[in-house]
Amino acid sequence: MTDSEYISALKGLIDSAISVGRDWLWNDSDIMDTLTDENGFGLTYDDFVMAGFKEMADEYFN
C-alpha cells in the first residue's frame, strides 16, 4: 500500500467515524440534553459549530 492509498483509506475511515458519531449524537436526545442544558452549562452553539457540527447546531439551538 502506498502512502497516498494509506492516507486515502485513513481519510475514509475518519469520515465514516464522524458520520456515525453525528448520527448517534443527534438521534439521542438525552445526550444532547446532557451536553446542553437550560442553566448555560455544557456545550454552546459556537462549540458545536467549531467542532464541525453546524447543521446540528442550527437544528438543535433554533
Regions found by a protein language model. Name each.
Residues 1-7:
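Ankyrin repeat (ANK) tandem alpha-helical domains that serve as protein-protein interaction scaffolds
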Residues 12-62:
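Acidic, low-complexity, intrinsically disordered interaction modules
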